[in-house]
Amino acid sequence: MTDLMTSCALPLTGDAGTVASMRRGACPSLAEPMQTGDGLLVRVRPTDDSLTLPKVIALATAAERFGNGIIEITARGNLQLRGLSAASVPRLAQAIGDAEIAIAEGLAIEVPPLAGIDPDEIADPRPIATELREALDVRQVPLKLAPKLSVVIDSGGRFGLGAVVADIRLQAVSTVAGVAWVLSLGGTSTKASSVGTLAGNAVVPALITILEKLASLGTTMRGRDLDPSEIRALCRCETSSERPAAPRSAAIPGIHALGNADTVLGLGLAFAQVEAAALASYLHQVQALGANAIRLAPGHAFFVLGLCPETAAVAQSLAASHGFRIAEQDPRNAIATCAGSKGCASAWMETKGMAERLVETAPELLDGSLTVHLSGCAKGCARPKPSELTLVGAPSGYGLVVNGAANGLPSAYTDENGMGSALARLGRLVRQNKDAGESAQSCLTRLGAARVSAAFEQG
């Protein structure tokens, strides 16, 4: 979802005809794929709110034909295709263009996954997003902005974007005069710096003003670097007592009734990945049930549209057989993983296999009250923020960080031979010490980091 839109973006090539390498800090794209441990990786951000099933099937077919057949949905709800080569990226771009999938480039402009159809949203944010894209498109000289700069236009609803970090955030609020938009800078909705309130017709001019300010300061500047009081004056924001509603955290996996007999099915990818053939097979099956489109969603998830309550239940059962996360209670929802050693040259852990081992040996940890982060290295790409339990791969084995991020100092260690028993001991620690009605998170907090570390390392 960005300001620049094309049917497909042909990769740039260097003098030797190879795909251009990424500039530091940039997101991988068709024009600038990223080298990984399993070949080149491309991130695809469709401009359409909904992708028809034939388009997704065509994309899956192309991913298998021109890559290694692994498709990912990122934490922010973008598609990634893996295992490409310098020769196959242009052919992938052509296949995407032939499927008439419009790809977004440049500034990320994000709206909630069910924007326009969520009965609980305060306003439809898509017209503002479209107006902003168009305003940026017509500029004779494009703005030079930080590569990962993002604008979130959050209308609330069941699946709002309050937990998504943004450089510039707009949150809809209901006022006596109608809908207004609260402007803030940096962070999630609870940590962002508030600027002020804007009327609907003032939103896009204000956003352009902020983007111009960022561009004038250089391509490394982010929303957090701006002075809220200066932006308040520049954008002529009003101060108001209106505050956005607290962000909702409805789980995406599951069947969701939207009213008027409309039903959507939320599904998650197991450990952020799916095989292209499995995805295409599933979409063919649900197409026969009446499904007509999907919407990508944060949290490595997507929604299936066009179902009724009866067919949604069938589609959910089919999804389970294909390995998707189908319900809020799925233990895999509580695990965050990066690509791991199979997909990243920096990783020292095969994270997907480790995640499966964790589900099998320590299900007591995965009640949904905490997150277990499996990181191939100390960079912590899958989850930069702290987790209750973080397992980090290293040349000598694995480290455990309790209540910290992957770059934190581990408090316990084990090697490959001891990992299975270490995970089992953590599960047993919770099982044997958890009080009735107590969550795994509360239990581990009560026991303390020292005891958790000792169980992992020594038993």
Swiss-Prot record:
One of its GO terms (biological process) is cobalamin biosynthetic process. [4Fe-4S] cluster binds at residues 338, 344, 377, 381. Keywords: 4Fe-4S, Cobalamin biosynthesis, Heme, Iron, Iron-sulfur, Metal-binding, NAD, Oxidoreductase, Porphyrin biosynthesis. Pathway: Cofactor biosynthesis; adenosylcobalamin biosynthesis; cob(II)yrinate a,c-diamide from precorrin-2 (aerobic route): step 2/10. It comes from the Bacteria. Gene3D superfamilies: Sulfite Reductase Hemoprotein, domain 1, Sulfite Reductase Hemoprotein,Domain 2. Its EC number is 1.14.13.83. Siroheme binds at residue 381. One of its GO terms (molecular function) is heme binding. Belongs to the nitrite and sulfite reductase 4Fe-4S domain family. PANTHER family: BLR3264 PROTEIN, FERREDOXIN--NITRITE REDUCTASE, CHLOROPLASTIC. This is Precorrin-3B synthase. It comes from Sinorhizobium sp. The gene is cobG.
